[in-house]
From Swiss-Prot:
Purpose: Binds to sigma F and blocks its ability to form an RNA polymerase holoenzyme (E-sigma F). Phosphorylates SpoIIAA on a serine residue. This phosphorylation may enable SpoIIAA to act as an anti-anti-sigma factor that counteracts SpoIIAB and thus releases sigma F from inhibition.
Keywords linked to the UniProt accession: ATP-binding, Kinase, Nucleotide-binding, Serine/threonine-protein kinase, Sporulation, Transferase
Designated name of the protein: Anti-sigma F factor
Reaction catalyzed: L-seryl-[protein] + ATP = O-phospho-L-seryl-[protein] + ADP + H(+); L-threonyl-[protein] + ATP = O-phospho-L-threonyl-[protein] + ADP + H(+)
Family annotation (InterPro entries): Anti-sigma-factor_SerPK (IPR050267), Anti-sigma_F (IPR010194), HATPase_C_sf (IPR036890)
SUPFAM superfamilies membership: ATPase domain of HSP90 chaperone/DNA topoisomerase II/histidine kinase
C-alpha cells in the first residue's frame, strides 16, 4: 500500500462537502485528471449522502467513516455507517429505487457510484450498518 487515510465525522449533511474535498486532497498525489477527480468526488458524495439520509435517517449524532487507500495507480474508498442497514440490497441497487420517496431523492445513488467508479461492493446487515467499497484505477 502506497498511502492511506481515515476520516470520521458526524452525519451532518454539511459534512458531505468536507468528505468530498478531503478525499480529493488525498488523491491529488496521483495527479488525477479533472474527469477522474469529478467522478470520485461525485461517488463519495453519493455514498456519504446515503449513509446520512438512509443509514442514520438524518440522526446527526452518528458517525460516518471514510477510509481511502492508494495502491500503485488504484484508489480504494470505503464509506461506512453503523446505521439501520439495507433490508433488500438487490432492490436498493435498482435504478430509481428509493426507500424515501417523500424526500424527492432520485434513487440513483448506487447507479451513480457504479457509473463513475470501476467497481462497487456493498455490504449491509439490518440494524448493523452498511459498508460501501469503491475502486478506481487512475490513468497516471
Amino acid at each position: 500500500m502506497d498511502n492511506k487515510m481515515r476520516l470520521e465525522f458526524l452525519a451532518k449533511s454539511e459534512n458531505e462537502g468536507f468528505a468530498r474535498v478531503s478525499v480529493s486532497a488525498f488523491i491529488a498525489q496521483l495527479d488525477p485528471t479533472i474527469e477522474e477527480l469529478t467522478d470520485i468526488k461525485t461517488a463519495v458524495s453519493e455514498a456519504v449522502t446515503n449513509a446520512i439520509i438512509h443509514g442514520y435517517e438524518c440522526d446527526e449524532s452518528k458517525v460516518v467513516i471514510i477510509e481511502a487507500s492508494i495502491c500503485e495507480d488504484e484508489i480504494s474508498i470505503t464509506v461506512e455507517d453503523n446505521g439501520i442497514g439495507i433490508e433488500n440490497l438487490e432492490e436498493a441497487r435498482e435504478p430509481l429505487y428509493t426507500s424515501k420517496p417523500e424526500l424527492e431523492r432520485s434513487g440513483m445513488g448506487f447507479t451513480v457510484m457504479e457509473t463513475f467508479m470501476d467497481s462497487l461492493e456493498v455490504y449491509s446487515e439490518k440494524n448493523k450498518g452498511t459498508k460501501i467499497i469503491m475502486k478506481k484505477k487512475m490513468n497516471t
